[in-house]
Swiss-Prot record:
Keywords: Antiport, Calcium, Calcium transport, Coiled coil, Ion transport, Membrane, Metal-binding, Mitochondrion, Mitochondrion inner membrane, Phosphoprotein, Potassium, Potassium transport, Transit peptide, Transmembrane, Transmembrane helix, Transport. The modification Phosphothreonine is found at residue 178. PINK1-mediated phosphorylation at Thr-178, positively regulates its mitochondrial calcium transport activity. This is Mitochondrial proton/calcium exchanger protein. The keyword Ribonucleoprotein does not apply. Residues 94-194 are mitochondrial intermembrane. It comes from Bos taurus. It catalyses: Ca(2+)(in) + 2 H(+)(out) = Ca(2+)(out) + 2 H(+)(in); K(+)(in) + H(+)(out) = K(+)(out) + H(+)(in). Its main location: mitochondrion.
Amino acid sequence: MASILLRSCRGRGPARLPPPRSAAPRGPAGDLACLSGASAVGLMSYVPLPLGSCAPVRPVYLSLRADPLGCWTLRPKRACAVLAGPRLLPVRCWHSSRPLGDDSVVEKSLRSLKDKNKKLEEGGPVYSPPAQAAVRKPLGQRVLDELRHYYHGFRLLWIDTKIAARMLWRILHGHSLTRRERRQFLRICADLFRLVPFLFFVVVPFMEFLLPVAVKLFPNMLPSTFETQSSKEERLKKELRVKLELAKFLQDTIEEMALKNKAAKGSATKDFSVFFQKIRETGERPSNEEIMRFSKLFEDELTLDNLTRPQLVALCKLLELQSIGTNNFLRFQLTMRLRSIKADDKLIAEEGVDSLNVKELQAACRARGMRALGVTEDRLRGQLKQWLELHLHQEIPTSLLILSRAMYLPETLSPADQLKSTLQTLPEIVAKEAQVKVAEVEGEQVDNKAKLEATLQEEAAIQQEHREKELQRKSQAAVAQAAKEVEPEVVAEGAPGRPVAELQPEEPAVTLPSEVLKDSAPVLEGLKEEEITQEEIDVLSNACSKLKEQKKSLTKEKEELELLKGDVQDYSQDLQEIKKELSKTGEEMYVEESKASKRLTKRVQQMIGQMDSLLAQLEADQKAGRLGPAAEAAPAGETVISVSELINAMKQIKHIPESKLLSLASALDDNKDGKVDIDDLVKVIELVDKEDVHISTSQVAEIVATLEKEEKVEEKEKAKEKAEKEAAEVQN
């Protein structure tokens, strides 16, 4: 089961775009995508076209005091050769840790408890009271409900087992999983441990025992092999890598498992069902508190993964992103833009809206889909402050806020009414998953029927993605085959029976000078050179692996192990804070951690101790010279390499044009000091490799800037939390 971690979530189908055209004819009225009952957004007619390039769009300034982020445009199509020759396989990304800002179920439960206690202290309502008291059901009805619960539970167990077995079989045979598939697999594992608690004693103890056997039987399941002088070093590094990824996956599974609240009566799930019924069916307006409360459940990843294509196109047009391409490409550029906006919001809140000048205010409002031209400075500051209030204080997801702007609702509507209209446009699958999420956050018993429906809908979406990729692959193969067949036919059309030397070239038609039209636009020769294909991402991964091996660097493993220890510590601290918050209302005795979660936590702690021993053994052997020559680099800069070293390593693996290598190296060297950190480079590769898109070197620079911005925000938040804890300890 944990072998999922031994393969990257990489997509192989490149996202291509149609060639640039003149003004496309607008479609009929049916081509308008109506996002609400009262407003519509006019979209271009979507027609399947051969995939190529698109016209560039103007950049949008997101960072307030940094370089502008350019547009996300794809480059012309180019033939990709198969990478062959080197024995060193690519270093694939693992994607087992949670993305920045992706909170676990326990963290969401803690935040929900803090909000409730804060509202109780302020005297406000925690949630809308029920219209009437619950009536105790008859005994026969309760028995039937219990039987239905177990019936759907067994169905869910059977379907989860089938899906998990199919995904595991694909991984063992060298196939990769998409981001959606991996998220589905993680949820299924958490469900299996929840439905069958004793499964821990059957599966987990044999994971570490069987993984070395699986590595021997299925070598393709490993993301990379190590080209070393010592087989012992290779074995130890593989063992360390396997244990590290397995422990990270188990920790993610622990954080996905919800707490048990014995005092919960299912009120939160019922409240959500009533709320969604009001906005979808009855037309009754829910309270502002209900809208704000349940809007938090529709997270960015959940919303973007389930939006329809017209909605994705509308969001891209609103944010001035490329609106033509595959759904994966549209989601990727929207995800990157939302991540950049999140980091910018926190930086703006720290600096203060009043510290921004007019140009910065216009850039910030424009990047968030709000009016930026033709409005007063006070209006700009007001709408930006409202955005920060909703996003940072009310914790409304960014995707919902931008989607509400894409609907062009009247500006006189309140934020609650805008969110209500936005929620009405979301697909049904989003509501199903949100219903399951609210039960997990509140610690209530998860409805097996709702969980089953959400799992089946997610599986249907995964199968649809597979069909689209297969159709795209067949279409590209057919186009390539047709191009090969056309070339000999054109040559053979010369004049049959006559030698080629006798063929006289046709005289060109005489054209009057007044009729000659000259194109004064510059020819974009370097456009094709800037594209980074999936093959070149593999070459870059190879270069990183080779350079790290030359330096005998274990910094990445050390960093990931420290992050894992931090996740385990944060999880235990969250549990303690939950008990502290519950003690204010006298309910701490009713909420507890599940047995499977406790057992998995003990196993993860044991594996952390084993990995510490492995790291110590590897470092001792390297210093003693038993694993080859010791590294000469200083520990402080062992992962920092020069740009020339990176270029030379890529040249040794695969021939790439010099101009592209220089452009790529310049994009990775953000501070232009001629040095690149290998670990930072690996992070960029992991982010790009798991998406099914092609990017340019300029977009690589934007990704580097976004990651650095997020790291800066994360460091500030950690420093702030540390200062608050120290202040609390001093007061106590």
